[in-house]
Amino acid sequence: MDKSELVQKAKLSEQAERYDDMAASMKAVTELGAELSNEERNLLSVAYKNVVGARRSSWRVISSIEQKTEGNDKRQQMAREYREKVETELQDICKDVLGLLDKYLVPNATPPESKVFYLKMKGDYYRYLSEVASGDSKQETVTCSQQAYQEAFEISKSEMQPTHPIRLGLALNFSVFYYEILNSPEKACSLAKSAFDEAIAELDTLNEESYKDSTLIMQLLRDNLTLWTSENQGEEADNAEADN
């Protein structure tokens, strides 16, 4: 299949909600080695976000069941083995994406917004790995995630408008990283609030094309801030993340 056929197949897979097929098509497009267009970049991101999202959701449910079966050895063992199976799938998907990012996507990215998009993606997928990791492996994935987010953050601050949806999406996910992974609510709130305030101050720079995306992410930033600063917040806060 040539590139245009692979992209067409990815779009068809998306409409059929067959995200594993969509990811396989976009992986093949990426491995052709050319820089991806914005449309191709978004197709790749949506495909893997859905593929990994299904496993993250399953992992959380099974982990919760596993904890509730304490005292019932047989049921707990079954839950543990099933969690480990899902964990392996999740890790394989993340390693797949990180391989594409390191080999093709980050090195080939020319415009700053592409570089930020892919470095944010790198931060995201190391974050997903860290959610299921433990010990030295957890520390390594946390460090790699923070480094990727930080590099993306610095480029976005110097090269992109505060209202740019990719810059806002990065701030959203980086703040979730601080809150959930590093357990630093103050840093998470500070980052989210700065991103929101800077975007509000420059709302007049919003172009029509990205208005909807930018305002949606600003709302998510505000929702997280409200959640994080409320005194009655539960332990299992369901924090909003950027889709792309």
Curated annotation (Swiss-Prot):
Its main location: cytoplasm. It is found in: Cytoplasm. Disulfide bonds: none annotated. Keywords: Acetylation, Cytoplasm. GO terms for biological process: axis elongation; gastrulation with mouth forming second. GO terms for cellular component: cytoplasm. SUPFAM superfamilies: 14-3-3 protein. The keyword Secreted does not apply. The record marks 56, 127 as: Interaction with phosphoserine on interacting protein. SMART domains: 14_3_3 (SM00101). The modification N-acetylmethionine is found at residue 1. Signal peptide: none annotated. Homodimer, and heterodimer with other family members. Adapter protein implicated in the regulation of a large spectrum of both general and specialized signaling pathways. Binds to a large number of partners, usually by recognition of a phosphoserine or phosphothreonine motif. Binding generally results in the modulation of the activity of the binding partner. Belongs to the 14-3-3 family. This is 14-3-3 protein beta/alpha. It comes from Xenopus tropicalis. The lineage of its organism: Eukaryota, Metazoa, Chordata, Craniata, Vertebrata. The gene is ywhab.
